[in-house]
């Protein structure tokens, strides 16, 4: 038997690209997420030019969010060299910005890193040749090690990973082939296979696929705002998932006000009743949100 307290509902979105003129642009999205989820995940590119001024505007909108917020920064958030100030500004309104850090909510632990690029599989860049190439690969390796260290510190039954760059090729498919090496790295996948990770959320790939799996079957979700708009044109641009305490994978949320408990649709008011085991296949759905976001990765 599972009750509502045995399930954590996650809302996830990425690449909001807040600019100096974005005040209020995501208020409707944040309001609906607050009503629908237990935790909000933001997977990078929170600002457009990496300016503290942009982060302050986003922070004003996030201050009204009535649920915990967990975030990682993306490449745009590093553009102006103000990433530490951005993290502090967001932290002042309660956002848990992870960079090799962990955060726990009930039975779910969250590990977050920015990640980096380099390509996937046999096409991945190797540390050979000029120093700048070696430094490039080293950055990705360091991000992977940082993720591994964070996962090792989690003691929760379920482990969820946030990153900005993609850990698998599957969720960047749809992007121009020539930019694959700059969208993520399969080196980020390696730590996921060493731990019992429940699900992975990332952004960055604006034209990528909505979901995929690692080689070992871990579900990976691309929650880039632009990708959600493109992949689900009839759905608002954020996704909701229920993470049960048992071994079931994250399940889709059929609609606002309902919670899938152990694989059977129940209203929240009836969530304390008995239910069957969870689904054996990840399903996903978008829930209500608002327009906005940038086209750049």
Question: Where are each of the predicted segments found?
Answer:
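Active-site-proximal beta-strand elements of phosphoester/diester hydrolases
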Residues: 7-17, 107-119, 160-162, 219-225
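Short amphipathic alpha-helices and their capping/turn segments at secondary-structure boundaries
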Residues: 1-2, 28-34, 87-107, 146-155
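Binuclear metal-dependent phosphoesterase catalytic core
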Residues: 2-7, 104, 178, 186-198, ...
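Active-site-proximal segments of metal-dependent phosphoesterases and phosphodiesterases across multiple
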Residues: 126-127, 131, 154-196
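Active-site neighborhood of phospho(di)ester-bond hydrolases with catalytic His/Asp-centered motifs
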Residues: 12-14, 40-45, 69-75, 96-100, ...
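Binuclear metal-dependent hydrolase catalytic cores centered on His/Asp/Glu-rich metal-binding motifs
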Residues: 108-156, 181-186, 236, 243
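Metal-dependent catalytic neighborhoods of phosphoester/phosphodiester hydrolases
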Residues: 21-25, 46-63, 73, 78-93, ...
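N-terminal active-site segment of His-dependent metallophosphoesterases
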Residues: 1-67, 78-81, 133, 137, ...
């Amino acid at each position: 038997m599972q009750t509502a307290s045995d399930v954590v509902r996650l809302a996830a979105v990425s690449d909001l690209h807040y600019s100096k003129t974005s005040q209020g642009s995501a208020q409707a999205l944040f309001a609906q997420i607050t009503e629908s989820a237990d935790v909000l995940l933001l997977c990078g590119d929170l600002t457009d030019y990496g300016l503290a001024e942009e982060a302050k505007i986003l922070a004003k909108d996030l201050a009204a969010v009535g649920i915990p917020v967990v975030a990682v920064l993306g490449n745009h958030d590093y553009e102006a060299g103000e990433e530490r100030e951005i993290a502090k500004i967001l932290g002042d309104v309660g956002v848990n910005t992870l960079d090799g850090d962990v955060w726990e909510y009930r039975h779910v632990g969250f590990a977050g890193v920015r990640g980096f690029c380099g390509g996937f599989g046999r096409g991945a860049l190797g540390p050979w040749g000029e120093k700048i190439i070696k430094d490039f690969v080293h950055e990705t390796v360091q991000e992977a090690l940082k993720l591994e260290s964070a996962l090792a510190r989690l003691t929760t039954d379920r482990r969820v990973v946030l990153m900005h760059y993609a850990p698998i090729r599957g969720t960047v498919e749809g992007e121009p082939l020539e930019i694959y090496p700059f969208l993520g790295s399969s080196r980020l996948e390696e730590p996921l296979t060493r731990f019992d990770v429940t699900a992975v959320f990332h952004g960055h790939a604006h034209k990528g696929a909505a979901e995929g799996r690692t080689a070992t079957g871990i579900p990976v979700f691309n929650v880039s705002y632009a990708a959600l708009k493109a992949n689900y044109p009839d759905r608002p641009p954020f996704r909701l998932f229920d993470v049960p305490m048992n071994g079931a994978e994250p399940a889709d949320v059929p609609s606002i006000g309902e919670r899938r408990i152990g694989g059977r649709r129940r209203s929240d008011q009836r969530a304390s009743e008995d239910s069957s085991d969870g689904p054996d296949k990840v399903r996903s759905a978008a829930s209500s949100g608002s327009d906005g976001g940038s086209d750049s990765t």
